[in-house]
Amino acid sequence: MKDKVGRIAVIGATGGIGAALSDNLMELFSSATLLAVGRSVPSREKTVGQKAPVCIGGFDLLDEESIHDTCSRIVADGMPDLVFVATGILHDGDAFPERSIKDLDRQAMEHLLAVNLVGPSLIMKHLLTHVPRKGAFRMGLLSARVGSISDNQLGGWYSYRTSKAGLNMMIKGAAIELKRRNRDAILVGLHPGTVESALSEPFQRNVPPHKLFTPEHSARCLVEVLLSRSPDQSGLCFDWAGKEIEP
């Protein structure tokens, strides 16, 4: 796969994991063209022998017109061989994950679903129709273990769990449709683990130190997982170690 990667897109390249993915992929595929997509994407310094990323700013995950326009820019010079969608939120502002169903708030829930489910689904809508009918193609979207219905033994976190469970179903359905277009294409969900960030800080207390990852470590793992998947695994969800997460 490494020798065949000429174009890469990282959507959500301004976030901690997205930025780390961009850095890792530029190092791994130094001759490839990397498209770094975000609301505002800072320029990055390139190392010797390494291309600078092509930055695509002004991306709004909550606006389908923006998603359509951005996807059109991504495929303008050819469909990428490798795509990561590194978008998503756990909480926003004062809206923390619900401990009880009594904590549900319509506005907060709709926002979380818009960011974690609707936005990534529309990215798939506007990108997957450009996948070539032959040849390798890989796409991974950030999901989460808590989106697994069978794994839910604690309850709570209603909106976040629901948004990720819905995303996993969208990935499964889109992968089935994509296989009819290109039998070698791979589309999967990826669980990055608990990553050190301002958003995860309130929930790090009970996380064992060896399971609290830096963005760089998580990114390296996710790249390895996506590159090692086979077409018969398309539509599934995997954690950072490559272990399948049951629905």
List the predicted regions and their residue ranges.
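Conserved Rossmann-fold SDR core element
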Residues: 178-195, 233-234
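N-terminal Rossmann NAD(P)H-binding glycine-rich loop of SDR-like oxidoreductase domains
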Residues: 11-27
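Conserved glycine-rich Rossmann-like NAD(P)H-binding loop of the short-chain dehydrogenase/reductase
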Residues: 26-46
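A short helix-coil junction within the Rossmann-fold of NAD(P)-dependent oxidoreductases
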Residues: 28, 78, 126-135, 181
